[in-house]
Swiss-Prot record:
Belongs to the LOC1 family. This is 60S ribosomal subunit assembly/export protein LOC1. GO terms for cellular component: nucleolus; preribosome, large subunit precursor. Residues 144-167 have a biased composition (Basic and acidic residues). Required for efficient assembly and nuclear export of the 60S ribosomal subunit. One of its GO terms (molecular function) is mRNA binding. Keywords: Coiled coil, mRNA transport, Nucleus, Ribosome biogenesis, Transport. Transmembrane segments: none annotated. It comes from Candida albicans (strain SC5314 / ATCC MYA-2876). Residues 1-25, 144-206 are annotated as: Disordered. Residues 118-196 form a coiled coil. Component of the 66S pre-ribosomal particle. GO terms for biological process: intracellular mRNA localization; mRNA transport; ribosomal large subunit biogenesis. It is found in: Nucleus, Nucleolus. The gene is LOC1.
């Protein structure tokens, strides 16, 4: 007769058979908490997987009626990168930075205004309210002078155009008058020629 096994021996025998290696994440509570804080790196697919029955039905419909055309997308939905466009002859594309304004070398007014407005953020670190108000007043005054100068330039341009048109009109008027005088003189000379009697030829016999 075989010797009887004790309960502890039996337990050890069964435990050895079913022993598994568990990760520290599940056994250690601190590691478990760290894992809980990690974000889900791979998002779940939103498209549901269709069942086998639905797939069979879909395939049968395709066999009977043919496959449907897929969804049509517009160009702006496809995120296609813009390619180099063809150059249109005669059209000159603008080059350079957008909104870039060049200042003339002799334009002291604009230069002063720009310098004062650029240094604005550096000057306001340690300045009194009186100094700040004085500086802002200077900037406003320079801007006002710039606006007045622009308006004056517009007026001068308009006046120049008007003078040009007036001179053109006066030249055209004088040429018209000259042509009219010449025409009148020609008509008068023709009338005189018609009125003067034609000389008769005289024949003398000896």
């Amino acid at each position: 007769m075989a010797p009887r096994q004790s309960k502890t021996a039996k337990r050890n025998k069964t435990q050895n058979k079913t022993r598994t290696v568990d990760s520290e994440v599940f056994s250690d509570s601190a590691a478990k908490n760290l894992l809980a804080d990690q974000p889900k790196l791979t998002p779940k697919s939103k498209v549901k997987k269709i069942s086998k029955l639905a797939l069979k039905k879909q395939q049968a419909k395709i066999r009977l009626y043919g496959a449907k055309n897929g969804k049509e997308y517009r160009e702006d939905q496809l995120n296609i990168p813009t390619l180099n466009k063809a150059i249109v002859p005669g059209v000159k594309a603008k080059r350079g930075k957008k909104g870039k304004k060049f200042v003339d070398d002799n334009d002291t007014l604009t230069m002063n205004r720009l310098v004062k407005s650029i240094n604005d953020k550096y000057d306001q670190v340690n300045e009194s309210k009186l100094e700040k108000s004085r500086r802002l007043e200077e900037i406003r005054d320079l801007k006002r002078q710039e606006i007045e100068r622009k308006e004056q330039q517009k007026k001068d341009k308009l006046e120049g155009k008007k003078d040009e048109l007036r001179s053109k009109a006066s030249v055209a008027r004088s040429t018209r008058r000259k042509n009219a005088k010449a025409r009148r003189a020609d008509e008068e000379s023709q009338e005189q020629e018609e009125e003067s009697p034609k000389k008769k030829k005289k024949v003398s016999f000896v």
